Amino acid sequence: KDEVYNWKNTKYAIFRNTWDYFEKFEEFNNWIIKTKTKTKFINCIELVKWNTDKKYLKFLSDKGINVSKTEFINKKSSISLSDLFKKTQFDQAIIKPCISGAAKDTYRLNKSNFHRFEKTFNSLLKKNDMIFQEFLSNITIFGEISLIFIGKQFTHAVKKIAKKGDFRVQDDHGGTVEVYNPVKEEIEFAKLCVSKCPSQPIYARVDLIY
């Protein structure tokens, strides 16, 4: 953040290190609105804003992309975790805000222990739209694959692995990263995901979990 910098001096701006945008989302959104008339964002501003809210998963699902089974809960809803487990029949689940990152306020729970998280869930729900998502246990065994595209071209991939005893693959939580060589089917699926975005990104990352 630099209030002094004149963005009219910049022809293009790439979103590179906005790791905490979700903690200051209103401020971030206001900056976007103010700055979009002074420079050109890469990716386009409409796509950036679309991608900040994990409701994009429903958009992709409606386009035929296979995504993790997910329930979206509106802020200030009275629904409980008990209700959600009954509705979905998930054995394990993840809860997190729709606008979030780096696994902040992300919790893993199951049918036996969800009662311990009701208070936390209700507290988060007062301020956020929330996700209730089926937990895919393979992430603790195999990890999460990220495929990177520049334009429409696949460039490289990595595998993110959670530390032992955790499910969060981010390095903030002890996760590690290694080079990954995806098979053709993984690349093609990731390309399909990118093609379904509301507009075509100049750069993109697609995360895969088995």
Q: Which sequence ranges carry the predicted segments?
A:
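Conserved N-proximal alpha/beta basic substrate-recognition cap immediately N-terminal to
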Residues: K1-K75
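Short, solvent-exposed loop/turn elements at beta->coil junctions and helix N-caps
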Residues: D2-V4, E134-N138, D207-I209
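Short amphipathic alpha-helix with an adjacent loop that forms part of the alpha/beta core around
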Residues: E3-N9, S80-T88, F121
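Structural motif
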Residues: I14-R16, I94, I131
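Short acidic/polar capping segments at secondary-structure boundaries
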Residues: E46-V48, I73-S78, C98-A102, S112-F114, ...
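Rossmann-like NAD(P)H-binding beta-loop-alpha module
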Residues: G64-A93
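Phosphate-binding site of ATP-dependent enzymes
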Residues: K104-V194, P198
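Conserved metal-phosphate-binding beta-hairpin within the catalytic cores
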Residues: P198-Y210
